[in-house]
Amino acid sequence: MGYLYPLLIIISIASLILDYLYLISKKSAIEIVNDMGIGYNLGYLFDCYNTSEEIKTPNEQITLWGNSPPNKQLFNFLKKSGFKTIRFPITWMHFMDDSGKVNPLWMSRVKEVVKWIIDANMYCIIDVHNDATDRNWLSEGIASKYKFKYLWEQIANEFLRILMKNIYYLKL
């Protein structure tokens, strides 16, 4: 039952984004999904969590599990290799204050990667990831609903300026 509210927000956001994509592309939701084609998961970079180390900078989180940070060339290579969609899982909890405000350095780093994906003419699926796992901030009850809504407001406000092919969802 605790996931009902976030799920309703997700459905509403997805519906609004698909409506927006239809307006700018004149494609139906089915056509957009079909156009997304083969996807690539950009995992184990921005979604690290549950560590004993304190994470202070975006680069510390991105490299925490031993991976190299992504770069623009990666997305150009993936596009040339036939991928059309990038799933971009992001864990926000290390870069949010108690009210849910996202650290501007983290949002800037996320935005940089999204821009590279869009510049490569690919779809980008932003996935609020690991924040909803057991014992993380999205399991804190009613207070987490407001933080969750505030997080998506920040994401939407940040990316509305560059929104051409972005679809947002939460993995529950």
Predicted regions and their residues:
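N-terminal carbohydrate-binding accessory modules
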Residues: 19-85
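An active-site-proximal structural segment forming one wall of the substrate-binding cleft
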Residues: 66-83, 102-128, 138-169
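Feature marks short, highly hydrophobic, charge-poor N-terminal signal-anchor/signal peptide-like helices
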Residues: 2-6
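Structural recognition of the beta-strand scaffold that forms the well-ordered cores
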Residues: 37-42, 85-89, 124-127, 168-171
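Short Asp/Glu-rich motifs
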Residues: 97-98, 135-137
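Single-pass alpha-helical transmembrane signal-anchor segments in small membrane proteins across taxa
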Residues: 8, 12-16
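Aromatic-lined carbohydrate-binding/catalytic grooves of carbohydrate-active enzymes
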Residues: 83-104
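Active-site-proximal loop/turn and secondary-structure-junction residues that shape catalytic pockets
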Residues: 92-94, 130-134
